[in-house]
Swiss-Prot record:
Annotated organism of origin: Arabidopsis thaliana
Cofactor details (free text): Binds 1 zinc ion per subunit.
Gene name of the encoded protein: RPL37A
Alphabetical UniProt keywords: Metal-binding, Ribonucleoprotein, Ribosomal protein, RNA-binding, rRNA-binding, Zinc, Zinc-finger
Cofactor: Zn(2+)
Protein name: Large ribosomal subunit protein eL37z
Cellular component per GO, a single term: cytosolic large ribosomal subunit
Upper classification of the organism: Eukaryota, Viridiplantae, Streptophyta, Embryophyta, Tracheophyta
Length: 95
């Protein structure tokens, strides 16, 4: 049997599984390498010929649990656990 239409029904093994770094189904099982982010290599795989792909995966497209709070915390020089001073005099005199 050739590799054309008739043989596609016989394909049942997965060559790629989920990658632990990027989460995509791009980790090649036999090669042990991710085709999307190049895990386990230290440097993440990006190419400028795929600008749209970089735009999809860049910082700001996800939740940014930590990073979205940094500008607000920067205003107070990253102080934490202190009591805020009252803004108006009436609240300051009553307490």
């Amino acid at each position: 049997m050739g590799k054309g239409t008739g043989s596609f029904g016989k394909r049942r093994n997965k060559s790629h599984t989920l990658c632990v770094r990027c989460g995509r189904r791009s980790f090649h099982i036999q090669k042990s390498r991710c085709s999307a982010c190049a895990y386990p290599a230290a440097r993440k795989r990006t190419y400028n010929w795929s600008v749209k792909a970089i735009r999809r995966k860049t910082t700001g497209t996800g939740r940014m649990r930590y990073l979205r709070n940094v500008p607000r915390r920067f205003k107070t020089c990253f102080r934490e656990g202190t009591q805020a001073t009252p803004r108006n005099k009436a609240a300051a005199s009553s307490s």
